[in-house]
Regions:
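Short glycine-centered segments of the SAM/dcSAM-binding site in methyltransferase folds
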Residues: 115, 197-198
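Conserved core of the PLP fold type I
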Residues: 62-190, 207-208, 212-218
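Walker B catalytic acidic pair
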Residues: 203
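Short, Asp-centered acidic motifs that coordinate Mg2+ and/or phosphate
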Residues: 34, 165-166, 198
Length: 218
């Protein structure tokens, strides 16, 4: 799993959203700008991953994929090894990514006109997903305590209108980087239970944790 973090790879003019669309989206030249606006790394993946992809490519046939037992086994092993979370592989439902999966969950557990709770600031795409689906965003602002974002459930309780059906949680929190504690996650669960909310937990950054912190799956 060795990686070379010193290798500089030029991704400009490769149809890279991160680099080639900076000017179109933000008016910043890709030649001079620093694209810190999206979570997209410029490092090659570990060789074992590239080799596996190349093996599939070299086979030359790209038909429908099935028989995902190895895939599910790998997910089970990683979550147990990394987070001590012993899942049942039957719980896994594969989507086309975070945005697609979150949209599907919101549409499944709410109806047009219902409210969706967000602890803000949060990943901006969630606002678009909710509004385009005909739902209403209810912002529950995090408290910025000298650069440390905190939750205020007494205030959030007062904001609830009664039509909320879903809480979209970012854990670890994007953009602040907060890793929610066991106590905070328990309070979030209690808040959701009080207001009969389905929690949709975005944990895409769960493996990017600084030393001294522990991610706890929701």
């Amino acid at each position: 799993f060795l990686m070379n973090f010193d290798e500089i790879i030029n991704r400009k003019n490769t149809h890279s959203v991160k680099w080639d669309m900076m000017e179109e989206l933000y008016g910043v030249s890709k030649e001079n700008g620093i694209p810190m606006w999206v979570a997209d790394m410029d490092f090659r993946p570990p060789k074992c991953i590239s080799d596996s992809i190349k093996k599939m490519y070299d086979h030359g046939i790209y038909g429908y994929f099935g028989d995902d037992k190895d895939y599910l086994k790998s997910i089970h092993w990683w979550l147990k090894h990394r987070h001590n979370w012993d899942i049942d592989p039957s719980w896994v439902f594969t989507t086309h990514g975070l945005v697609n999966g979150t949209s599907m969950a919101i549409q499944t557990y709410s109806d047009p006109g219902d409210g969706v709770v967000l602890f803000t600031p949060i990943y901006y795409v969630f606002f678009k997903q909710i509004k385009e689906g005909g739902r209403e965003v209810l912002e529950c602002p995090l408290v910025n305590n000298k650069g440390h974002y905190e939750l205020d459930f007494e205030y959030y309780d007062s904001l609830m209108k009664g039509n909320e059906k879903v809480l979209v949680l970012s854990s670890p929190h994007n953009p602040s980087g907060r890793v929610w504690t066991q106590k905070e996650l328990t309070e979030i669960a209690s808040f959701a239970q009080r207001h009969d909310l389905v929690v949709v937990s975005d944990e895409i950054h769960n493996d990017l944790i600084m030393p001294g912190y522990k991610h706890i799956p929701m």
